[in-house]
Amino acid sequence: MFDAMTDAVTQDMSKILQTKAADLSGERLRNVEAALDATAQQIRGHWSAASDQAARSDFSVLHDGITAARNIVVHIASMR
């Protein structure tokens, strides 16, 4: 459903601190952030197309979770 969430991205997310330590350029965390951002945009599209309030509510909760995950990734990426 969310194409940006590839196996590589989800594996990097599951071990985010190890990913940060191994990725001196920061590219992998930027890829995770971009995937989460793209997924949030897709969710907004699904929310707009939802036909009932329950579905919109579900998509809102999902969007909030993805946005929180993105914020965590940004925070971890900025840690020294």
From Swiss-Prot:
<dbReference type="InterPro" id="IPR048129">
    <property type="entry name" value="HrpD6-like"/>
</dbReference>
<protein>
    <recommendedName>
        <fullName>Regulatory protein HrpD6</fullName>
    </recommendedName>
</protein>
<comment type="function">
    <text>Involved in the regulation of several genes of the hrp-hrc-hpa cluster, which encodes a type III secretion system (T3SS). Upregulates the expression of hpa2, hpa1 and hpaB and partially controls the expression of hrcC and hrcT. Controls the secretion of the T3SS TAL effector AvrXa27. Also regulates the expression of several HrpX-regulated protein (Xrp) genes. Has no influence on hrpG or hrpX expression.</text>
</comment>
